[in-house]
Amino acid sequence: MNNEMKRSFRIFILKILAVVFVLTMCYFLYAFVYRARTELPTKAVVTNRASAVYTLRGQMQMLSQKEAFSYFAFDGREKEKEYGTYVIPGLKNTRTLLTEKGATQAMCTSMTPQGLAVTEDYVMVSAYCSTQKHNSVIYVIDKETHNFIKEVILPGQPHVGGLAYDPDHKLLWYSSNINGIAQAVSVKMDTIEAYDYDESHLPVDSQQTVSLYGIVRDSFMTFYEGCLYVGCFEKYNESVIARYGIDAEGNLINTMDKELGMNFEMAVPLDYSTISEQVQGIAFYNDKLLISHSFGILPSRLVVYEQSDKRLYVNENSARTYRFPERLEQIVVEGDNLYVMFESCAYAYRVSSVNIVDLSLIHI
């Protein structure tokens, strides 16, 4: 090959690399930036009930490539309704409010699921608008029939990364914030059951709103043995779970302590536990603590720890680790069942996710 041919070949290779680079950048900008900031137009006037991407059969076929996860999710559940799984509603269209215009009705096509709670009668999923135009919501699903019942509109645009159910006082807690201060908000289950979007076109009323001392963000939460556990997501550093006390009425215990730098009442943790980075949810099961880890397009992990007085739940102390599809969010234990939820089915993440997963019920 003479010098001229070598030069032409190098130019050809450089052109191919340039095209590949441009196409890669276009894909990245579309999948990770554009879709997170835009919404699809819609003519719908109600919240959709069907799955956003897969039928149940399609979901099972896709997950069959993940043998361990598929086994946990579907094995032995043939006689259960929809193999024990629940569809996350509202990911195509959700009735909500246009935040800047108060009680103005609106449809959102960019809801992203985050929090998960299971009560005696319902499965509830929280979601926020990825374009930050609409109020956050909670989807209420009938636990027995698996049917979507209604959407409950929340005040403002909290990320609602965590839901927690207090079965003793029949209260649902959700994570929020104001002016950069982490908050926990409770809503009576009676209020949720009575809520009617068509009647009020207003956000649901809360029972208690409490600022949380000692935690930067309330990214996830759970309720266990009369206490509210709240954790903070950190991308690359260890973080904490804070345990807060509840009084006889089901309210978080507030205090005003100027020695702690407070100038208003806040809930102060009873104690802290140390956790590893990238935690999205926690759940207690007998003498074990289950922690979900995920970040971006990397595979998720479900890590099992033995509960310890040292309260040090970092990777090197784990008892067992399971590999899950990407974008695993909150987890909930009820009896011997583990409910897990993924945000990969949201409009903002569908193109950038290899494995798109709806809500699943996994048997421990």
Stretches with model-predicted labels:
Residues T104-C108, V152-G156, T209-G214, L270-I275, ...:
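Surface loop/turn motifs at the tips and blade-to-blade linkers of beta-strand repeat domains
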Residues V187-E199, R243-K258, E306-L312:
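Short loop/turn segments immediately following beta-strands, especially the blade-tip
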Residues L97-K133:
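Beta-strand-rich domains and repeat architectures in extracellular enzymes and scaffolds
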Residues S110-G115, Q157-G162, L212-T222, S276-G281, ...:
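Repeated scaffold domains used in trafficking and secretory/extracellular systems
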Residues V118-E120, P167-H169, F223-E225, F284-N286, ...:
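Residue-level detector of Asp-centered blade-edge/turn motifs that repeat once per structural unit
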Residues R311-E334:
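Conserved blade-ending motifs and adjacent loop-strand segments that build the rim/top face
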Residues I362-I364:
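Conserved small/polar residues in nucleotide/adenosyl-binding loops
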Residues P269-Q307:
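Loop/turn-rich, solvent-exposed surfaces of beta-rich toroidal or solenoidal domains
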